[in-house]
Regions:
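Acyl-donor (CoA/ACP) binding surface of acyl/acetyltransferases
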Residues: 1-40, 71-174
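Short, intrinsically disordered/low-complexity patches at protein termini
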Residues: 50-52, 61-64, 105-106, 161-162
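A short helix-loop-beta-strand connector motif used in the catalytic cores of GNAT acetyltransferases and
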Residues: 58-73
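Intrinsically disordered, low-complexity regions enriched in Ser/Pro/Gly/Gln/His and often acidic
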Residues: 8, 48-49, 57, 65, ...
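Conserved GNAT-fold acetyl-CoA-binding loop/helix
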Residues: 38-58
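Short, conserved alpha-helical segments within structured domains
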Residues: 45-49, 70, 133
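Hydrophobic alpha-helical core bundles mediating ligand binding, dimerization, or RNAP-core interactions
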Residues: 28-33, 53, 57-60
Length: 174
């Protein structure tokens, strides 16, 4: 497992990854109930309360013990920006990234940091992302090197799966 707090510096921000259990649960409730965020989360719902946040956080954090990877809390310039990382989905390490709208412009830098860890220190052979069919603006994922890899249903919701291998990664990611 990676260290619990890692910092990545670039010209614009200080990016830190921490355990989800280090975040105030009210911040997670606020993020996961944000109407703009919910539009991007087909499995999300606006009734995500404090009790659900605590249970959800424990389940996400337990993936580190069970699979050797899991999602992190993401901080940008010492502010909670969201959560993301690799989470177990149907046998795959699936990349999830949920950011507060104030931080949506930071997604690519966070993605690069996660993918680099996945293929170096974590030794992943591939990672996936799942997108709902309603997400039609997806040219960017192909530029990053993702390839179509079938479809899956999770909790009754249909997703398209895309897979990234180290050898298909775009040079802009490495």
């Amino acid at each position: 497992m990676l260290s619990l707090v890692e910092a990545v510096f670039n010209l614009r921000m200080l990016l830190k990854f921490k355990r989800l259990t280090e975040v105030d649960p009210l911040d997670i409730v606020s993020l996961n109930n944000n109407p703009d965020v919910l539009l991007q989360m087909p499995l999300g719902s606006a009734n995500f309360d404090l009790a659900k946040a605590k249970e959800w956080t424990q389940q996400k954090d337990a993936q580190w013990q069970q699979y050797g990877y899991g999602p992190w809390a993401i901080f940008i310039d010492q502010q909670f920006a969201g959560w993301g990382g690799l989470q177990y989905e149907e046998g795959d390490a699936d990349l999830a990234l949920v950011l507060h709208p104030n931080f949506w412009g930071s997604g690519k830098a966070i993605f690069i940091a996660i993918v680099k860890r996945a293929f170096t220190s974590m030794g992943m052979e591939s990672i996936t992302i799942l997108l709902p069919p309603s997400r039609t603006r997806i040219k960017g994922i192909f530029r990053l090197g993702f390839q179509p890899d079938g479809e899956v249903d999770i909790e009754g919701t249909h997703f398209q799966r895309f897979r990234l291998y180290p050898h298909t990664m775009a040079r802009s990611v490495t």
